[in-house]
């Protein structure tokens, strides 16, 4: 084992593995590759900004401190980190790849696996929360914050463990024949294990939502109200978009785990599938704000404040009687509106 870890700082190991698994090492920085890299980085910056606005909105407004929105905030955090990880992955790809040590390569790829794991477990936590809210039409107990934080913390801990297994030793540095083609320093068995875990979790989430749907449709009006159905529709859309975006990448990884080295040319195009999967982190904030009026107002508040600030600067020296009115909080916009206080209505009353 000591010999294995001693290879982590050997800069020749990465090139050795790429030479073994790839037919050709096309690592030249061409103009088209530069344009593609620039586009991906811009896309990832948009992902970071979008999800940061969602996190700020959830943090600053107490209306969004319910279990449902905290779990959505956790999903936004994983999407934000996914954007950061993909920027790092893009900057450290191409010609830079062959100059990396195995340790740096594991850090580059492991960060992406960690954020993916966090997204999957966030979706599972949301499904469990919906099941609890539907099954128990009452507010959580006084220990709800502790239990939510423990669930979120556990999801990140498991994600760190899953993403960190290769750097802890589950890799193919000493066994070239066991290496993945898409991820040449990862063992095929590790890739197969992770994709299987994710697939089983996603199937379990789908089964949970099917069960919740039938429970809601067959329940009384206090459970199957329009807000409850709208919130269920929102989280179902989030799940569906995740599956659509990641299914091609999961399929490529499953093929990679079973295909002999250099026998499946489609594996050399895997980066297109992962780029498509990244769209999931871009679309999630759009879904949240599209489906929730209050969250949409809160997310747009910093942009409106910035716009009003520019307008105030442009009017300096003008009519002193003309002043900008401060933005009202989203909660004040709904003042006077009384809604039922069961958890399904309490957490779903902002969904359109």
UniProtKB/Swiss-Prot annotation:
GO molecular function per UniProt: G protein-coupled peptide receptor activity; G protein-coupled receptor activity; G protein-coupled receptor binding; integrin binding; sphingosine-1-phosphate receptor activity
Glycosylation sites: 19
Membrane topology: Multi-pass membrane protein
Pfam families linked to this entry: 7tm_1
Transmembrane parts of this sequence: 35-59, 67-95, 110-128, 148-173, 190-210, 234-255, 272-292
GO terms, biological process: actin cytoskeleton organization; adenylate cyclase-activating G protein-coupled receptor signaling pathway; excitatory postsynaptic potential; filopodium assembly; G protein-coupled receptor signaling pathway; negative regulation of excitatory postsynaptic potential; negative regulation of smooth muscle cell migration; negative regulation of vascular associated smooth muscle cell proliferation
Primary localisation category: membrane
Coiled-coil residue windows: none
Cytoplasmic side: 60-66, 129-147, 211-233, 293-352
Tissue note: Expressed in all developing tissues with highest levels detected in primitive, transformed cells. Relative abundance: lung > kidney = skin = gut > spleen > brain > liver.
Lipidated sites in chain (S-palmitoyl cysteine): 305
Gene Ontology CC: one annotated term: cytoplasm
Topology Extracellular: residue spans: 1-34, 96-109, 174-189, 256-271
Domain of life of the native organism: Eukaryota
Subcellular location(s) of the protein: Cell membrane
Keywords: Cell membrane, G-protein coupled receptor, Glycoprotein, Lipoprotein, Membrane, Palmitate, Receptor, Transducer, Transmembrane, Transmembrane helix
Function of the protein: Receptor for the lysosphingolipid sphingosine 1-phosphate (S1P). S1P is a bioactive lysophospholipid that elicits diverse physiological effects on most types of cells and tissues. Receptor for the chemokine-like protein FAM19A5. Mediates the inhibitory effect of FAM19A5 on vascular smooth muscle cell proliferation and migration. In lymphoid follicles, couples the binding of S1P to the activation of GNA13 and downstream inhibition of AKT activation leading to suppression of germinal center (GC) B cell growth and migration outside the GC niche.
Family designation: Belongs to the G-protein coupled receptor 1 family.
Name of the protein described by the UniProt record: Sphingosine 1-phosphate receptor 2
């Amino acid at each position: 084992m000591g010999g294995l870890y001693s290879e982590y700082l050997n800069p020749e190991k990465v090139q050795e593995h790429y030479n073994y698994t790839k037919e050709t090492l096309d690592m030249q920085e061409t103009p088209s590759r530069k344009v593609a890299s620039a586009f991906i980085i811009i896309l990832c910056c948009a992902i970071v900004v979008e999800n940061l606005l969602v996190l700020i909105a959830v943090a600053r407004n107490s209306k969004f401190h319910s279990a449902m929105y905290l779990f959505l905030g956790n999903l936004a955090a994983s999407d934000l980190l996914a954007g950061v990880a993909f920027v790092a992955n893009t900057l450290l790809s191409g010609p830079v790849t062959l100059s990396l040590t195995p340790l740096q390569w594991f850090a580059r790829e492991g960060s992406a696996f960690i954020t993916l794991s966090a997204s999957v477990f966030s979706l599972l936590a949301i499904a469990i929360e919906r099941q609890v809210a539907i099954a128990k039409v009452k507010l959580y107990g006084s220990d709800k914050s502790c239990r939510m934080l423990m669930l979120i913390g556990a999801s990140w801990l498991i994600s760190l463990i899953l993403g960190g297994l290769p750097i802890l030793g589950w890799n193919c540095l000493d066994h070239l024949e066991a290496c993945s083609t898409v991820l040449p320093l990862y063992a095929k068995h590790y890739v197969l294990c992770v994709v299987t875990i994710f697939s089983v979790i996603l199937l379990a989430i789908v089964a949970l939502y099917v069960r919740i749907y039938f429970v809601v449709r067959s329940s009384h009006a206090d459970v199957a109200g329009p807000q409850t159905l709208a919130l269920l529709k929102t989280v179902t859309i989030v799940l569906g978009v995740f599956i659509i975006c990641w299914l091609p990448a999961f399929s490529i990884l499953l093929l990679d785990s079973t295909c002999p080295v250099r026998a499946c040319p489609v594996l050399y195009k895997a980066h297109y599938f992962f780029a498509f999967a990244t769209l999931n982190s871009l679309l999630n904030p759009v879904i949240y704000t599209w489906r929730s009026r209050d969250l949409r107002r809160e997310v747009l508040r910093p942009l409106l404040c910035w716009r009003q600030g520019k307008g105030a600067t442009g009017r300096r020296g003008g009519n002193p009687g003309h002043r900008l009115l401060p933005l009202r909080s989203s909660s004040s916009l709904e003042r006077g509106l009384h809604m039922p206080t069961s958890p399904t209505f309490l957490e779903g009353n902002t969904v359109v």
